[in-house]
Regions:
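Flavin-dependent oxidoreductase catalytic cores
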Residues: 1-408
Length: 408
């Protein structure tokens, strides 16, 4: 029996918690509940062919068994020509479409046993967040500000758009239920096109917000033409940047040099008009990383007031991410109309059974993400190692350490 002992949400009722297990739709795809496993990179655990081997399969399957209604893969890069990612470390489905399709079809079938849907991310690139990659304009590199990037030519931009569309076509042929565009958030390449501070172009892809959004619009139009209007597209969107300048964050959000909330809400409306079926929202960029990947001292649910503004502006689902690993806060946000579903990335690493424990009336049994950023993003960004979790030693190693029956 559910009992609410949460000090911050004493008014959350059993009925509020039950609503987390009602279905919702992304386009024509029905998701069984309001819990979505968020996208996280899986570099380092794929096989030599960059296939979705047993390690990858069991990692995702564990979250399906734990009750997640939607799983969104970590970023899959699409460019194999202009920014050529090493296939040994940065998986692109277009490096070997046959191998990708084989693994994706198997994963979709296995997830289906738990009525879990699969969306795959597709990325145009990382831009200035790492050295050696092209950007909308010549920009200082995030980690090495003394270095500057090379701007993409107009022809290169158009080719990158074509490769995004080609990847979406492969996803649909592989049985993947939908695509999430990565990403108008965190300051990745698409985000750099959309933000005025990183887009100083003078061609059709620069200038006004409409022009800066043109890359995103043309990708969406291409997917509709290739895959049909009913193939659902989600967009990962940062509603506000919290930056003062390159490599300078703004904790309070004052003197915003990146995306303001007002512009973020306007982008939501534009994306809906383009035919996007859901928005997966958060805040922050690499330049304000404590917002993009908030540590323990950032309060849970810190972005909900901003997400509510997006929800008021559009009629498509708002999937709320960033420190949402608290079922009471999720239930209250759903009840109060601040979001439609909840994107749990690090919390799904910490406890794959987060939804199931909530549904069974045992939310206090959830192993919480502690927001340390050490085992997950820290290993990837700082050490170049595969992700892990400080509180769950089986995370991304499920195939090596299968569950065992208790001996007592």
């Amino acid at each position: 029996m559910y009992e609410n002992h949460h000090p911050n949400t004493p008014e959350v009722t059993q009925e509020d918690m039950n609503q987390l297990f009602t279905p919702f739709n992304i386009g024509k795809v029905q998701i069984k509940n309001r819990f979505c496993m968020g996208p996280m990179g899986i570099s380092g655990i794929q096989g030599s062919l960059q296939d979705w081997n047993d390690v990858v399969q069991e990692y995702f399957l564990e979250r399906a068994k734990g009750g997640f209604g939607l799983i969104t893969t970590g970023v899959l890069f699409t460019d194999t020509e202009i920014d050529y990612f090493d296939p040994k470390s940065m998986k692109s489905p277009l490096h070997n479409p046959t191998v990708f399709r084989r693994g994706a079809e198997r994963l979709v079938e296995r997830l289906g046993a738990y009525d879990t849907k699969l969306f795959c991310q597709a990325s145009m690139g990382v831009g200035r967040t790492a050295p050696g990659f092209k950007t909308p304009s010549s920009l200082p590199i995030y980690s090495i500000p003394s270095m500057t990037s090379t701007a993409l030519t107009t022809d290169e931009v158009k080719r990158k758009i074509e490769l995004m569309v080609k990847t979406a076509e492969l996803y649909k042929k592989s049985g993947v239920h939908g695509i999430e565009l990565h990403a108008v958030h965190w300051g990745y390449l698409l985000d750099q096109f959309v933000m005025a501070m990183t887009n100083r172009r003078t061609d059709e892809y620069g200038g006004t917000l409409e022009n800066r959004m043109r890359v995103v619009k043309e990708i969406i139009e291409g997917i509709h033409q290739t895959c049909g209007d009913d193939y659902p597209i989600s967009v990962r969107l940062g509603l506000k940047s919290y930056v003062k300048a390159f490599n300078k964050a703004s904790l309070t959000g004052e003197n915003e040099a990146g995306r303001t909330l007002e512009e973020g809400v306007e982008i939501c409306k534009m994306l809906e008009s383009y035919g996007v079926k859901a928005l997966s929202v958060d805040v922050g960029t690499y330049d304000s990383f404590y917002y993009a990947c908030p540590p323990a001292y950032m309060p849970k649910g810190h972005g909900l007031k901003l997400y509510a503004k997006a929800k008021e502006a559009v009629n498509i689902p708002i999937l709320a991410g960033s420190r949402m690993g608290d079922p009471w806060i999720c239930a209250k946000a759903l009840r109060d109309g601040q979001a439609d579903a909840f994107v749990l990335s690090r919390p799904s690493l910490a406890d794959p059974e987060f939804p199931k424990k909530t549904e069974l009336g045992m939310p206090e049994k959830i192993r919480p993400c502690i927001g340390c950023n050490f085992g997950c993003i820290g290993r990837v960004e700082d050490q170049g190692l595969p992700p892990a979790c400080a509180v769950n030693p089986r995370a991304m190693r499920e195939s090596f350490y299968p569950p065992r029956k208790a001996t007592t």
